[in-house]
Design a protein with these regions (language model features):
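Single-pass alpha-helical transmembrane signal-anchor segments
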Residues: 2-22
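N-terminal start-of-chain detector that recognizes signal peptides
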Residues: 2-6, 62-71, 166-172
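Generic signal for short, ordered secondary-structure residues
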Residues: 4, 11-12, 74-75, 103, ...
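Short low-complexity stretches enriched in small and charged residues
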Residues: 8, 47-56, 149-154
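Hydrophobic membrane-anchoring helix/hairpin
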Residues: 19-133
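Amphipathic, coiled-coil-like alpha-helical scaffolding segments used for oligomerization/assembly
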Residues: 84-87, 91-93, 97-99, 116-205
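Long, charge-rich amphipathic alpha-helical coiled-coil "stalk/tentacle" segments
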Residues: 198-218
């Protein structure tokens, strides 16, 4: 009977059902189960989930396993021209690290990484612009809070005769912390945890460097 057409068809149908029921969750992913497009149950292998990675089962043809990355992910912003408090223009290039902390909320609001990166572009870009606008260029350039004036490499390389900058009050690292603090709650509503934001690169136009020299001479 097993080798008859009916028996073979039954075996094929059974295999389809079994494979449709079982699925494996990797250590690097977390899963939200949906039934007819709506989430059911708790996320699997999430940070605060009771169920972990391994073999799991769902109702075939009715439920779908939606997988999301559990690892730390990177965000790389586009260089953007911004204005400092002292009305100088600088091109700021930022990057950050983030992760999906609440896969259910992430699924309900964003669904995929492309949408998440687009939202991160908007929020981090906006908060970076706000922070830069509240501080003078010297605070963006310098990355330490040393009270002793020191040579700034970028200005020195520009060929100017004056490269000694005044001491700073805050410094770039504190500005990065301010960007992170402002952006974190805004992306948190989408189930995203923003781990850090860093200023990767700063570019000045020649006119900006000349203005810095003029101010330091005066």
């Amino acid at each position: 009977f097993l080798f008859s057409p009916v028996g073979l068809a039954g075996l094929v149908l059974l295999a389809i059902v079994v494979f449709g029921c079982a699925y494996t969750v990797d250590q690097t992913e977390q899963v939200v189960i949906t039934q007819f497009g709506r989430p059911v149950g708790s996320p699997i292998n999430a940070v605060d989930s009771a169920s972990g990675a391994g073999l799991h089962f769902k109702i075939p043809f009715v439920q779908t396993a939606n997988s999301f990355d559990k690892r730390i992910l990177e965000w790389d912003g586009q260089p953007s021209e911004m204005t400092t408090r002292d009305k100088l223009y600088v091109v700021v290039d930022t990057f950050g690290r983030w992760r999906i902390a609440d896969p259910l909320r992430y699924f309900q609001s964003l669904r995929d990484e492309r949408s998440a990166l687009s939202r991160l572009d908007d929020i981090i870009g906006s908060e970076t612009r706000n922070v830069i606008a509240r501080h003078d260029l010297i605070e963006v350039v310098r990355s330490d809070k040393d009270r002793t004036p020191e040579q700034d490499a970028i200005l020195a390389e520009s060929g100017g005769t004056i490269g000694v900058l005044p001491p700073i009050r805050i410094g770039r690292h504190r500005l990065e912390d301010q960007i992170l603090a402002a952006a974190s709650p805004k992306v948190g509503i989408w189930g995203i945890e923003l781990l850090d934001v860093k200023i990767k690169r700063l570019n000045y136009k020649q006119g900006v460097i000349e203005k810095i020299y003029d101010r330091m001479k005066s």
